[in-house]
């Protein structure tokens, strides 16, 4: 509950559902405004360019559950790639192993997907791995171990049937394939990735 509470608080502060399901803003929650005495006034005020970049960076960082150090390392990787920098940044984040486990519907949140990987419940191309930050390529195969299938949150997540279009899964065997890189239209719409790019362009050389 401690982690869930912090996610709800961060989501309200950033005005964005980090869980991608708007649970943080559901009617059952006591607070729907930005935490703090002046939450509503802050939200309505005009933000500076710096503040907008910081907010978008935090939205993306907290949604994928990575540290600023990890973000900078990923950004350096993206700088070497061809194509649209902002789209490539999103694609690299989406290609992380913990995110793919989440996108395949094997875990209810990225955090729980990351824990599954950390504790050795996940096989990548038939090899047990414990590094959530591994970057996958299209064609890579992910599978959960037999004992993992019995974990309640794994069963519940799989039964929800929420699977992204750029992966293929088999809910009976709990295995899936990363079919292709996602299109921008298939990714979270509430983030302006161009602000994130501008933020890290100043910091990463």
UniProtKB/Swiss-Prot annotation:
Gene Ontology CC: one annotated term: small ribosomal subunit
UniProt similarity note: Belongs to the universal ribosomal protein uS4 family.
Organism expressing this protein natively: Mycoplasma pneumoniae (strain ATCC 29342 / M129 / Subtype 1)
SMART domains recorded: Ribosomal_S4, S4
Name used for this protein in its record: Small ribosomal subunit protein uS4
Coiled-coil annotated residue ranges, if any: none
Ribonucleoprotein recorded as keyword: yes
Described purpose of this protein according to its UniProt entry: One of the primary rRNA binding proteins, it binds directly to 16S rRNA where it nucleates assembly of the body of the 30S subunit.
InterPro entries: Ribosomal_uS4, Ribosomal_uS4_bac-type, Ribosomal_uS4_CS, Ribosomal_uS4_N, S4_RNA-bd, S4_RNA-bd_sf
GO molecular function: rRNA binding; structural constituent of ribosome
Keywords, sorted A to Z: Ribonucleoprotein, Ribosomal protein, RNA-binding, rRNA-binding
Single biological process term from Gene Ontology: translation
Pfam families with a match to the protein in the record: Ribosomal_S4, S4
Annotated ranges, domain S4 RNA-binding: 95-156
Disulfide bonds: none
Classification of source organism: Bacteria, Bacillati, Mycoplasmatota, Mycoplasmoidales, Mycoplasmoidaceae
Subunit field text: Part of the 30S ribosomal subunit. Contacts protein S5. The interaction surface between S4 and S5 is involved in control of translational fidelity.
């Amino acid at each position: 509950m401690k982690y869930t509470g912090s996610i709800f608080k961060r989501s309200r502060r950033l005005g964005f559902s980090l869980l991608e399901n708007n649970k943080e803003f559901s009617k059952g929650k006591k607070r729907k405004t930005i935490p703090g005495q002046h939450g509503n006034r802050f939200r309505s005020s005009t933000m500076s360019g710096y503040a907008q970049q910081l907010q978008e960076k935090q939205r993306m960082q907290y949604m994928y559950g990575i540290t600023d150090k990890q973000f900078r390392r990923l950004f350096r990787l993206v700088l070497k790639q061809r194509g649209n920098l902002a789209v490539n940044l999103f694609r690299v984040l989406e290609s992380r192993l913990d995110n793919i486990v989440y996108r395949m519907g094997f875990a209810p949140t990225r955090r729980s997907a990351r824990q599954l990987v950390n504790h050795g419940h996940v096989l990548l191309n038939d090899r047990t791995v414990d590094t959530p930050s591994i970057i996958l390529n299209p064609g890579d195969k992910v599978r959960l171990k037999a004992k993992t299938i019995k974990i309640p949150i794994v069963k519940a997540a799989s039964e929800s049937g929420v699977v992204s279009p750029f992966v293929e899964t088999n809910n009976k065997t709990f295995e899936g394939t990363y079919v292709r890189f996602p299109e921008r239209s298939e990714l979270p719409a509430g983030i302006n990735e161009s602000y994130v790019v501008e933020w890290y362009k100043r910091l990463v050389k």
